[in-house]
Amino acid sequence: MTFRFSARCRLIKRFLLRLLLACAVLWGGGVALFSIVPVPFSAVMLERQLGAWLSGNFHYIAHSDWVGMDEISPWMGLAVIAAEDQKFPEHWGFDVPAIEKALAHNERNENRIRGASTLSQQTAKNLFLWDGRSWLRKGLEAGLTVGIETVWSKKRILTVYLNIAEFGEGTFGVEAASQRYFHKPASRLTAAEAALLAAVLPNPIRFRADAPSGYIRSRQAWILRQMRQLGGEGFMRANQLH
């Protein structure tokens, strides 16, 4: 009995190691490939689509249209940086002071969890991983973040982020969002429109750009102020992000 149990444990360990190796090869290949190739779909898009089908919702379609940075208004990149990660051009994938503040806040407020994910971390998660707060997913996210920060430029990270971010039910990427909410291409987004889209990013299922609540309007105004304080379009040029 003991021998059989030990043999079974060895088989499980071997299987898990092979699975981990296969995932590492797959993710490493993805990091290298998507440094130059447009992203056709993300893990979050796949998760949303499969979830809809499994729940019997066959009308749901995860929609995205890839566009290059030269086809995206500079206001949009500036808006998500102002809203989500103002140290994006400076850090190496992680904002350590923000993480420390979030940990301290979460210890005091267990019912109001605050995140500190950078745009790089969000890109890694959205592109390759699943939703959740497990330590396993966080560990994989950290490794993938280091990978994309090593291989990709900051401009590339921002481009991919803007193309796979979720802006509403079935709406992924800034081009699809711009067409849905403003009926025009992402290249023509104004500062106010970009700030409105960025305002829903913390929870694009709960918050809506086409029916913004008072909270979203106040968040939009805050983002616009932050965009001005960062330096407007000049910030994007100075940091070679557009």
From Swiss-Prot:
Record function comment: Peptidoglycan polymerase that catalyzes glycan chain elongation from lipid-linked precursors.
Keyword Transmembrane helix tagged: yes
Official protein name in the record: Biosynthetic peptidoglycan transglycosylase
Pathway: Cell wall biogenesis; peptidoglycan biosynthesis
Reaction equation(s) it catalyzes: [GlcNAc-(1->4)-Mur2Ac(oyl-L-Ala-gamma-D-Glu-L-Lys-D-Ala-D-Ala)](n)-di-trans,octa-cis-undecaprenyl diphosphate + beta-D-GlcNAc-(1->4)-Mur2Ac(oyl-L-Ala-gamma-D-Glu-L-Lys-D-Ala-D-Ala)-di-trans,octa-cis-undecaprenyl diphosphate = [GlcNAc-(1->4)-Mur2Ac(oyl-L-Ala-gamma-D-Glu-L-Lys-D-Ala-D-Ala)](n+1)-di-trans,octa-cis-undecaprenyl diphosphate + di-trans,octa-cis-undecaprenyl diphosphate + H(+)
Biological processes annotated in GO: cell wall organization; peptidoglycan biosynthetic process; regulation of cell shape
Source species taxonomy: Bacteria, Pseudomonadati, Pseudomonadota, Gammaproteobacteria, Enterobacterales
Location in the cell: Cell inner membrane
Record's keyword terms, sorted: Cell inner membrane, Cell membrane, Cell shape, Cell wall biogenesis/degradation, Glycosyltransferase, Membrane, Peptidoglycan synthesis, Transferase, Transmembrane, Transmembrane helix
Domain of life assignment: Bacteria
HAMAP family: PGT_MtgA (MF_00766)
Family (UniProt): Belongs to the glycosyltransferase 51 family.
Cellular component aspect of the GO annotation: peptidoglycan-based cell wall; plasma membrane
Source organism (scientific name): Klebsiella oxytoca
Record-linked Pfam families: Transgly
Transmembrane segments: 19-39
GO MF annotations in UniProt: pentosyltransferase activity; peptidoglycan glycosyltransferase activity
EC number: 2.4.99.28
Membrane topology: Single-pass membrane protein
